[in-house]
């Protein structure tokens, strides 16, 4: 197949167009760079993500060839860029440890020790390489299992941003949602994962908008429903990055005590998508 017929999309060829698109979304000048720069330096939000940002630049793969059609690969690249622009636009990099959440009662002040970080402390693998890195460093020091806390926070905050994108960026919402549905189909089967990872996977799927077929370990059904309530709170338009932090504290407290053992497929149940968040759950998790 010749290059003219290839379904692959190359970042270099459309970088300037994407930069202008990003500027139109955020009204900010954002540099677009090759993701390989982060991979080579072993930094970024997650080592297996296909795109990331440090709050100033957005890092995208040099070539996208996930799908058979060029248009699908272009849409995928555009959706990745939109999500990272959303992280910049909607405050992922503006986290403040002491700032109150909008949807949750604040647990951070009750758990925090006096900060002992320094300006040279780069916290989590260089994803936030500016002043606010120390704020997240202070937050993640609350957790004995920082890897689990980071996984939870990444899922919750990405879910918040995606919900906000769907609400604010109406022009791309249809394409964005279609790509999310395709992404769900590529996710691992929940029944093949150990218990704790299955619950994390349920969070990913809920944040991607999946309503049917979300399976969770039956013996942890109550925890799964509580997590779903928090995921829904985070998806509300006025939720902030501080809400993502508060949700992380609550979800971590539930998942940390679950043994990450494999279960039989018969030990899973489907979450009832028709369940609504009650006033009681709102009082339990957040503000009335």
In which residue ranges do the predicted regions lie?
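Extended non-catalytic scaffold regions that mediate assembly and binding
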Residues: 268-275
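Acidic, Ser/Thr/Pro-rich beta/coil linker or hinge segments at domain junctions
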Residues: 259-263
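Segments forming glycine/polar-rich beta-alpha architectures that bind adenosine-containing cofactors
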Residues: 282-288
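Basic/hydrophobic alpha-helical interface regions
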Residues: 1-248, 253, 257
